[in-house]
Amino acid sequence: MTANGLLQICGYLGVLLALAKPLGSYMAAVYEGRSATVRVLASVERFIYRITGIDPEAEMRWTGYASAFLVFNLLGVLAVYALQRCQGFLPLNPQGLPAVAPDSAFNTAISFATNTNWQGYGGEMTLSHLTQMLGLTVQNFVSAASGMAVLVALIRGFVRRNADTLGNFWVDLTRSILHILLPLSFLLALLLIGQGVVQTFEPYRNVTLVEATGYDRPKQDEGGHPLVDADGNPVTEHVTVSEQTLALGPAASQVAIKQLGTNGGGFFSVNSAHPFENPTPFSNFLEMLAILVISGALCHTFGVMVGDTRQGWVILAAMTLIFVPLLFVTVLCEQGGNPAFAALGVDPAGGNMEGKETRFGIVNSALWATATTAASNGSVNAMHDSFTPLGGLVPMWLMQLGEVVFGGVGSGLYGMLVFAIVAVFVAGLMIGRTPEYLGKKIEAYEMKMAAIVILVPPLMVLGGTAVAVMLDAGKSSVFNPGAHGFSEILYAFSSAGNNNGSAFAGLAANTPFYNLMLGLAMWFSRYWLAVPVLAIAGALAAKNYVPPGAGTLPTHTPMFVGLLVGVVIIVGALTFIPALALGPIVEHLMMIGAR
């Protein structure tokens, strides 16, 4: 690795970690009602509650909190589905795009409501400006805020004693949007517009190329069948292209929240590899920073709200300790180039630049890929399908760990806290003592709920992959034979089953089979995790505080960091290494053998 590349990585991590404390403290003040913005915008909050009929003083039990969360998200799914199906009749559709097909609309609606943002369609070719703004961008805000609300409820479960309520979902949702996501998104959008990210309602523009280009395409008969000559070779015709269509739209406003809310769904088909969505190295840095900044800062928010900031730093340290080594593995694998070249005696001096933008290079592409899959973001500035086998394995495995290495805003931290509960339970088994975490006893009920949280994503990933490779409907979308084709299917279900949204794009996923299967995987992986987390929160809130004793495991020490990292990695390794061995690992071995 070059000194320049190392400097870029250190600069990114330095800024990210430096922002964790101030932003985390601010978010804690927002949720506790201490922030100056809460006082300044109190009239706006009251107006929102009044027109929606919400009593902000009404507290909810965990069941009521979960019901509000589920109903709100279900209404979001229905709204986005209806908007896509009716977009041909609605305004702000300068290209006259027709309604989205039912299966694709179903998949997209669930995808954005669950904070996954899996995209089987091409954004600028499928969705109108209105659908992008009113449907997808709104869901980017509310799905992120929903995850943050669930996290806040879990934190209150640790803080409260002998209580049967966890707060008010509608208040937590409103404050997440009004005081955190909206201001940050507005600031980031302005910075991105300054860098050249487009923000307009104008229709697409046709421009004349400086130099015309041409290509040969197969000729077809009236029935659309390819023509062949007497020898069976395809008959082609030369086509000259002198114009290009430039897709435009309100991209900057959507890009800002798609990054900050760990949503990831791009305005354009190639996401942040598109120059209108990510034109400069500085815009690239800002968008990469936005992927992890809220998730990292929420660790400090957690520490502040539980009254011991060391607890938050321990969680952040565990996340960083997993993230950094895997980042270096990705960078080194991509800089090493295709292993098949080395086996053939070819010197890949420039590394593996396939599928990458030259304006970003290998380090920034690998850093983005690692960050976007450590978080449940899924946006890309390079094509993961073109990474080397081991370079692509790291993003896949980061998703398979459960999106707890930073993870989604809210969902990443509550997932890691579930692993922390498992870690103290394991430690309690070793010393024969009832485990405790933050002064609350961890008993059978909490462990049952934690088991559901940990087991549902692997069930979606491995079960979905197994079904896809057994059925013709699943195999027909694979155009790369062998191990890489299997990797594409495994990556798709790893992404959907962990609410990430990125893809090995060589898989033709916009089919009824994949739209249905991946849609169900996204739905269950989001809500079968959030509801058990709220159940844990309710159980913990009802318990009394247990003062730490001589046998209590300290959870603010480097030893606990190591224990937590070990639990996360062991669970991930035992669950997915056999499947990874059939995909990227065997593909790497085949490339070494140059076969």
Curated annotation (Swiss-Prot):
GO terms for cellular component: plasma membrane. The chain crosses the membrane at residues 9-29, 63-83, 135-155, 177-197, 285-305, 312-332, 412-432, 451-471, 516-536, 560-580. It is found in: Cell inner membrane. GO terms for molecular function: P-type potassium transmembrane transporter activity; potassium ion binding. It holds the Pfam family KdpA. It is a multi-pass membrane protein. Keywords: Cell inner membrane, Cell membrane, Ion transport, Membrane, Potassium, Potassium transport, Transmembrane, Transmembrane helix, Transport. InterPro entries: KdpA. It comes from the Bacteria. Part of the high-affinity ATP-driven potassium transport (or Kdp) system, which catalyzes the hydrolysis of ATP coupled with the electrogenic transport of potassium into the cytoplasm. This subunit binds the periplasmic potassium ions and delivers the ions to the membrane domain of KdpB through an intramembrane tunnel. Belongs to the KdpA family. The system is composed of three essential subunits: KdpA, KdpB and KdpC. NCBIfam families: kdpA. This is Potassium-transporting ATPase potassium-binding subunit. It comes from Methylococcus capsulatus (strain ATCC 33009 / NCIMB 11132 / Bath). The gene is kdpA.
